[in-house]
Amino acid sequence: MMSKKLYIKTYGCQMNVYDSVKMQDLLYPFGYEPTENIEEAAVIILNTCHIREKAAEKTYSELGRIKKLQDTRTKQGLSSAIIVVAGCVAQAEGEEIFTRTPYVDIVVGPQSYYNLPELISKVVRHEKHLIDLDFVEEAKFDQLPEQLYPQGTSAFISVQEGCDKFCTFCVVPYTRGAEFSRNVEQVYREALKVVSSGAKEIMLLGQNVNAYHGKGPADKIFSLADLLKHLAQIPNLERLRYITSHPIDMNDDLIKLHGTEPKLMPFLHLPVQSGSNKILKAMNRKHDREYYFDIINRLREARPAIVLSSDFIVGFPGETDEDFEDTLDLVRRVKYGQCYSFKYSPRPGTPGATKTDQIPEHIKSERLTILQQELMAQQLAFNESCVGSTMKVLFDRNGKCDDQIIGKTPYMQSVYIQNPNKSLLGKIVDIKITKASLNSLTGEILVSHV
């Protein structure tokens, strides 16, 4: 079969990265091979994010650039590429995408992209403006192909999708649907596959991954803790992680597992969004700051070395200076290793967008600057505390310099070392940390590994 080129540009979360890999796997049997050169692509897929307005508008900006590429092809007498908008912008905006960008051929949601081969074949037969936004989570997981392209040393596996929490700022329940978990056998089989292909580390993915409740042997329902213990038995799998978690789903078994399972890394992303009880209630987060502090304390009791990460939103409607100070207070009390912070972005269709007490943009910007200064200071302090220590680093990619490779610590810090023959790629190695910056560490190979 003559190969055709497939170009995928991915926006947003790790789930989208995973979905893009699965799209490659879906289309490979039909003769489509991935390319990083958009100009040679027969099919162009934008796998999109709708979590913030800026992310959504990036899709339309990129589509404008693709339109110019299509026009150039036409002038040169070349065939046009098939253009697909996939992911959460597709789910949220649907037919509006065809109105704004009529040259798009296919709009497909995150729960129905397994139909891409059929949709693309219809476009080849000159059908236009095809759309599939069905919410059938069971069908998606049942239709996902087995891995064809190795993910490398670190692999993502989707185990849970959707969200039932309905935070008032968030589009996920509307774009990804209700919470649904893959069955244990599917997850275990995929984990065996990626490990046999060379993965040393697996990151389990879900919008609310710690709400996982998949069906296991004898129809037993497995919690996330059960699933992690099951996967930890796989030979040659050395590291396990999971993302993203909701505080209210951090149950006792999962917290205890952080203290008993050595393959479960001592790093947890646990978004809190705000430190103000008033704002947490307005966000419909279903917990208060005291509950969050209790979870953090219990995690640190179970595993004293655990390092935490979080998400924060500043400028949610009704946020006062006092509310913002509560957020700063929470940050200073918890002390994070790294964090992500954003200005509130009203999303159409969410309750937050209809609130009348929106915060002026300049105040959002001021608060974000103050918060990020605090978070960056904490991140730098944590990185600097690692200097002089020996850390186990999983090397997974080349650096920008010819003799450089990059790995990550158990705490998700990037570590740069000199390794001219690249002999340590794919290995976990003891590295002495010699230097720290805000975003990375520098290290040296211990004599025993030379």
Curated annotation (Swiss-Prot):
Residues the record lists as binding [4Fe-4S] cluster 2: C163, C167, C170
Compartmental location: Cytoplasm
Superkingdom: Bacteria
Coiled-coil segments: none
EC id: 2.8.4.3
Top EC category: transferase
Catalyzed chemical reaction(s): N(6)-dimethylallyladenosine(37) in tRNA + (sulfur carrier)-SH + AH2 + 2 S-adenosyl-L-methionine = 2-methylsulfanyl-N(6)-dimethylallyladenosine(37) in tRNA + (sulfur carrier)-H + 5'-deoxyadenosine + L-methionine + A + S-adenosyl-L-homocysteine + 2 H(+)
UniProt domain TRAM: residue ranges: 384-447
Note on how the cofactor is bound: Binds 2 [4Fe-4S] clusters. One cluster is coordinated with 3 cysteines and an exchangeable S-adenosyl-L-methionine.
GO terms, molecular function: 4 iron, 4 sulfur cluster binding; metal ion binding; N6-isopentenyladenosine methylthiotransferase activity
Subunit text: Monomer.
Family stated for the protein in its record: Belongs to the methylthiotransferase family. MiaB subfamily.
Protein name: tRNA-2-methylthio-N(6)-dimethylallyladenosine synthase
Gene designation: miaB
